[in-house]
Amino acid sequence: MIEPEFKDGLLPVIVQDYETLEVLMFAYMNREAFDLTCSTGIAHYFSRSRGKLWKKGETSGHYQHVKEMRIDCDRDCLLILVEQDTGACHTGYRSCFYRTIEGDVVGEKTFEPADVYKN
Amino acid sequence: MIEPEFKDGLLPVIVQDYETLEVLMFAYMNREAFDLTCSTGIAHYFSRSRGKLWKKGETSGHYQHVKEMRIDCDRDCLLILVEQDTGACHTGYRSCFYRTIEGDVVGEKTFEPADVYKN
């Protein structure tokens, strides 16, 4: 296996749908998240804002099933191809990149956040 | 236009082929690189290792012509869809993500670095 380089303990990760090739989201893994992703096949990340490990889908149930992992030429960025349950974005869109920079909505809404995130 | 958020002066950027949807590379823009990309339609980045602005293709001639820019839900990551001249990676592959984490080569080689990078 090619060993990724964690800069300041973190590895940037691009998440892409393995069938449609839509880019779904961008996040970071620390060593623990990377190891858990490899061992379980479910994407785990490190939340910089919350300062802790984050199993994607632990609240929403929208897990990411990892089909393939690729690493870039410098070994400091990861591309993972996943099967995404329902949607990746907390706003209800399948992809976090659902808007152009001009503000046009180009993504597909796949769930209602109010139905999923209940306190 | 939706204003991106530059954390510590930098914005992570995912670069995707606008036709094949192949993820080509990952880089960072500072404010100057972002503005130049918007005004010229040619991708510019900020090289963290060299500490300076970097017009992609300035040495190789392999420019990236920006077709669309998308921003994520948090406005702190950019996805740009480009027409890539020849190849994006300095190793000669079209994409920097030409290997799986297991080390299998899955990308296409599109040029010989020795022919392109001459001192």
Swiss-Prot record, chains A, B:
Its cofactor is Mg(2+); Zn(2+). Pathway: Amino-acid biosynthesis; L-histidine biosynthesis; L-histidine from 5-phospho-alpha-D-ribose 1-diphosphate: step 3/9. GO terms for biological process: L-histidine biosynthetic process. GO terms for cellular component: cytoplasm. Its EC number is 3.5.4.19. Transmembrane segments: none annotated. Binds 1 Mg(2+) ion per subunit. Binds 1 zinc ion per subunit. It is found in: Cytoplasm. It is an enzyme of class 3 (hydrolase). Mg(2+) binds at D72, D74, D76. Keywords: Amino-acid biosynthesis, Cytoplasm, Histidine biosynthesis, Hydrolase, Magnesium, Metal-binding, Zinc. Zn(2+) binds at C73, C89, C96. The keyword ATP-binding does not apply. InterPro entries: PRA-CH, PRib_AMP_CycHydrolase_dom, PRib_AMP_CycHydrolase_sf. It comes from the Archaea. GO terms for molecular function: magnesium ion binding; phosphoribosyl-AMP cyclohydrolase activity; zinc ion binding. It catalyses: 1-(5-phospho-beta-D-ribosyl)-5'-AMP + H2O = 1-(5-phospho-beta-D-ribosyl)-5-[(5-phospho-beta-D-ribosylamino)methylideneamino]imidazole-4-carboxamide. NCBIfam families: PRK00051.1. Homodimer. Belongs to the PRA-CH family. Catalyzes the hydrolysis of the adenine ring of phosphoribosyl-AMP. This is Phosphoribosyl-AMP cyclohydrolase. It comes from Methanocella arvoryzae (strain DSM 22066 / NBRC 105507 / MRE50). The gene is hisI.
